[in-house]
Curated annotation (Swiss-Prot):
Family, similarity comment: Belongs to the radical SAM superfamily. Lipoyl synthase family.
Coiled coil (UniProt feature): none
Annotated binding of [4Fe-4S] cluster 1, by residue: C50, C55, C61, S289
Gene Ontology MF terms: 4 iron, 4 sulfur cluster binding; lipoate synthase activity; metal ion binding
Record's protein name: Lipoyl synthase
The EC number(s) this enzyme carries: 2.8.1.8
InterPro entries: Aldolase_TIM, Elp3/MiaA/NifB-like_rSAM, LIAS_N, Lipoyl_synth, rSAM
Taxonomic lineage from the root: Bacteria, Bacillati, Chloroflexota, Chloroflexia, Chloroflexales
Location within or outside the cell: Cytoplasm
GO cellular component: cytoplasm
Amino acid sequence: MADLIPLIATDSLPSNRARRPEWLKVRAPGGANYHDVFRLMREQNLHTVCEEAHCPNIGECWNHRTATFLLLGNICTRGCRYCAIGKGKPEPIDEHEPERVAASVAHLKLKFAVLTSVNRDDVPDGGASIFARTIELIRQKAPDCKVEVLIPDFDGNWEALETVLAAEPDVLNHNIETVPRLFRRFRPRARFEQSIELLARARAARPYLVTKSGMMVGAGETNEEVYQVIDRLRDVDVNVLTIGQYLSPGASYWPVDRYVTPAEFAEFRRYALERGFRHVESGPLVRSSYHAHLHVNAQQH
């Protein structure tokens, strides 16, 4: 049996803060499927957010032969204070990346694929055309595979959003990440209301589409503020919600304020379901793509 290990990320917490609780420990990744996915990603020169963002669920997901593909390289043009993905000047767009991703999806015989990306403010459409092309090629090479896209805000470029929507993903996800009071410090180059507008526009343009959002807690928000964000997301008819514990990637990042208890996560879930969400994942280790294959069935009725 694999040992229990602390999560990869390290918190920049004062020394008098409580140690990380037992519920934030995971099994060390391993197993034949895990190594098969790892090898394929290296062979195809592909990136996954599972690795780049130090996801605690990488062992579980890769052993189920699922992964979240990170499009548009692994260097982001923004500097969000919570994110472990590298920042700086990215390489030119790799026009062949969609073919390699689609081939990998087919090779792994995935029934559900998640596509996300770094922010690419250096290109006019923010990389939307790469999302669209990847969806189209997955449809060709793995027609039984459902596709979720976890998209950036495209800096408010709604034509870019339509480019992605026109490729007909099964689930459109855009994470709100945190509460309005912390938003500009947590995500200096983004706006809370712009993210809400993106989700509203997606719903208006494709009423049948499953829409999804997620946030992290334990970053300094109050529980009341979490409930208010849940309300705002329901106001724009988001179907699926994920809520997980924020873990700081290191000393230069936004610090963890506290560890939210499993009981509080359960209460967030209860409230969100009561408000009308079709599916809610709420727990310390939940990340945006956790159990994503279950979310595709959360269509409106």
